[in-house]
A protein has these predicted regions:
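Short linear Ser/Thr-Pro motifs
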Residues: 44-46, 121-122, 160, 201
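Generic hydrophobic alpha-helical segments
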Residues: 35, 136, 163, 200-201
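Gly/Ser-rich oxyanion-binding loop with an adjacent helix/lid
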Residues: 95-191
Length: 201
């Protein structure tokens, strides 16, 4: 799949609430920098941390004014720094999700782990938000689950590179490599392990 496959100019006006839990992840093979438009310099592999996740709730309503508004709270409290980042992110993806321009968003996010614990909350928070937005969009599309998974990862990547690997697990690959046919720079690939690998001393 290529970038154009993820562009959705279709729009609608509706209201509702969506919710998503998304895990953080820990890299086994890190990526060392990114090229233009969040393309990784090298492939990376990670485990998702299913017990460490971000819960995000998005309420969407038809916009009240000419310009749509995005309101963000973290754990029920206003956070201006986070709100600026979320606003920048959401406005940067509107060409991929046409409904965004017609709706006000009320977003609340919270982690089930300490924010400064060393666990990558940016990965889980961006992937949770992207998952909510793609779920809203799915109201007007007939895309299958596999496409939606890839689009969630694609959108997550634009907010945080490592977030692209937090959509699903337990083992994921992000970055094109000849060693894995299904790999892509644009979204995650699931690595299927048929049985546990035993480490020998």
């Amino acid at each position: 799949m290529v970038e154009q496959d993820f562009i959705c100019s279709d729009s609608f006006e509706s209201s509702g609430i969506v919710e998503w839990n998304s895990p953080s992840n820990i890299a086994l093979v890190k990526y060392w920098g990114k090229k233009h438009n969040q393309i990784p310099q090298n492939p990376s592999i990670s485990f998702t941390l299913s017990k460490c996740y971000t819960n995000t709730v998005v309420e969407f309503k038809p916009k009240k004014n000419t310009q749509n508004e995005i309101h963000f709270t973290f754990d029920g409290k206003e956070n201006s720094d986070f709100e600026k980042k979320v606003n920048t992110f959401v406005k940067s993806i509107d060409k991929y999700s046409g409904f965004l321009k017609n709706h006000d968003l009320y977003i609340n996010s919270k982690n089930n782990f300490p924010h400064s614990s060393g666990i990558a909350s940016s990965a889980s928070s961006m992937s949770a938000l992207a998952s909510c937005l793609v779920d809203i969009e799915s109201q007007i599309t007939s895309n299958d689950n596999n496409f939606n998974l890839r689009k969630k990862s694609f959108i997550s990547r634009l907010g945080s590179g490592s977030a692209s690997r937090s959509i699903e697990g337990p083992v994921t690959l992000w970055g094109k490599t000849d060693a894995y046919k299904e790999s892509s720079d644009l979204y995650l690939s699931l690595i299927h392990i048929s049985e546990p690998t035993r480490l020998r001393s």
